Amino acid sequence: MTPEPTEPQIKVYRYRWVIIAVFAVINIVVQLQWLSFAPIAKAAQSVYGVSALQIDFFSIIYLAVFVIFCIPASYVIDTFGIRIGIGIGAVLAGIFGLMKGLFAADYIMVCIAQTGLALSQPFIINSTTKVAVRWFPITERATAGGIGLLSQFLGMIVAMIVTPYLISVDARGVYSISQMLMTYGIITAVGAVILLVFLRERPPTPPCIEGQDERFKVFEGLRHMLKNRDMILLIMVFFLGLGMFNAITTCIDQICKIRGLNFEQTGLVGGMMLISGVLGSIVFPLISDRLRKRKAVFLFTGICSIPGLIGLAMAGHYWGMLISSFAMGFFFLGGAPILFQFGAEINAPAPESTSQGLLMLAGQIGGILFVIGMNGLGMIPSMVVFIFFSLINAILFFLMRESKMIQPDLTSTMDGQAQ
């Protein structure tokens, strides 16, 4: 007699929270390095004797290197796994973070170190959805993605708020940034070691039913994604939305300088956007997972972010900038992890790291173009253009279709038994 087939027992493991925690640590330090000059651009200009655009170049390097290495990094992650993929990023971050601190006084050497740090970024960022799929059930994946994105915000928050307090100025008005860069270098190296010690490739048993984690190869997945109508719309959304965010955070010192804000106030304006983004990235993914809806939630956050952007463009005083920054960050950044998870779901069985990498690629290209445009057109006129772009994004959100994977009938069998 042939035994009757039985349903496989699905288990999720508590160690998944260790995985997402160490992944968060490496995200924090890499994003900290990205924006280390953003709130102190004027001081950095004085130290290196260069133009504002040359200081913005430290951020542009991150965006440009991501554009070049996005797909190769996704290939490594999908071919060799998250331990090797993220591990490569961690090693690069640790080495070049220390180099940036050791050669802090030399503009060229700092540019080289920043390039190495930028190379680490796609190996780490492109792994977010892969980590979520490898370790978490479908009903926790937007939450896991939200934690990954939250950690990126935390790194940016530290860069924005703490950096102005780590630079020094002597009686002659000469700035020093060496202590700040060395401190960040040591923190980055420690974060890399923590990641390498605790990261594991996969749990003993998968967190989903058989077949739910089957994936195309990278280039087959790319072809699949580029034939997907909703993915094309999502790429356009990230080109405009993430591009605007990258440009605003890069040029935050120039934006605030027009309003007469000092370094500390500039850092708080930028930090407020990111702090509220952390709150939003906790609240909205939980709502999305609980309601089992993606489109309705990110459409809501996209529309609600527009008044905050209008305030950043029009506010004439410090408190207006703070309030507007909070409003924009809470809704604009709060919807981001849902969009990443939505992209992974509508493109299944394409690799998650490839879908996330393609979306990030669009946003980085947009960021490069928008930073250059802001330095040419001017800060306030560019912010007005961004308001128009946000309205376009709201229309694109409306045109998208809901993810089928998140529907209740498909997720009811996928909840695991915690072990």
Language-model regions: role of each:
Residues 68-107:
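Conserved MFS/SLC helix-loop-helix module at the cytosolic interface between two early adjacent transmembrane helices
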Residues 69-81, 280-293:
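Helix-to-loop junctions at the C-terminal end of transmembrane segments
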Residues 344-378:
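A late C-terminal transmembrane helix in Major Facilitator Superfamily
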Residues 37-38, 228-281:
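Extracytoplasmic gate region of multi-pass secondary transporters
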Residues 292-339:
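C-terminal transmembrane helical hairpin of 12-TM major facilitator-type secondary transporters
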Residues 113-151:
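Cytoplasmic helix-loop-helix junction between adjacent transmembrane helices
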Residues 5-13, 202-234, 415-419:
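Juxtamembrane intracellular "pre-TM" segments in multi-pass secondary transporters
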Residues 79-90, 289-302:
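Cytoplasmic membrane-interface "Motif A"-like loop-to-helix N-cap segments
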